[in-house]
């Protein structure tokens, strides 16, 4: 099994890689500009977080649109990766009314997809100025915080998932469970 971590310049990309590796899966970090052919053997991809603002710097996200549409593997978007999935689906992302930094309580309204075996509420690590305002009807919004309406989502028919928070950071409760559940989707 092989999962590629697509590096969008996030400060915790190596933590995503290490978490997947520590769960026994071959994983490789690649820049978001790598040719899509490199990902032909992927069983899944993780779109890392990063400092780019979707509103003004979407070009800094390289080829991730092609990665999502060329192959039919599971995708997990984290932070700006999730925001890209929302934009790509026809949703809207813009500056957050309240930027989130540090621990926040994230509440789950549905625990399907990769969000099973997680309590109804968790402490999660946040680090974002932009947020998802809307997403296509093809997705289910399944988690929120008191200041961010879309903390997690999943596609109704495909294995595409997104989280605004950072499950790779130790301060996020049950973050490893989210990665384990994603890996299980990649095994199918």
From Swiss-Prot:
What protein does this entry describe?
A: GMP synthase [glutamine-hydrolyzing] subunit A
Tell me the route in metabolism or biology where this protein functions.
Purine metabolism; GMP biosynthesis; GMP from XMP (L-Gln route): step 1/1
Q: Which InterPro entries match?
A: Class_I_gatase-like, GATASE, GMP_synth_GATase, GMP_synthase_A
For molecular function, the Gene Ontology terms on record are:
ATP binding; GMP synthase activity
Gene this protein is translated from: guaAA
Please state every residue range assigned to the domain named Glutamine amidotransferase type-1. 2-188
- Write down the Pfam families for this protein, in alphabetical order: GATase (PF00117)
Is Ribosomal protein included in the keywords of this UniProt record? no
Family matches, as HAMAP family: GMP_synthase_A
GO CC list? cytosol
Keyword annotations for this protein, in alphabetical order, are: ATP-binding, Glutamine amidotransferase, GMP biosynthesis, Ligase, Nucleotide-binding, Purine biosynthesis
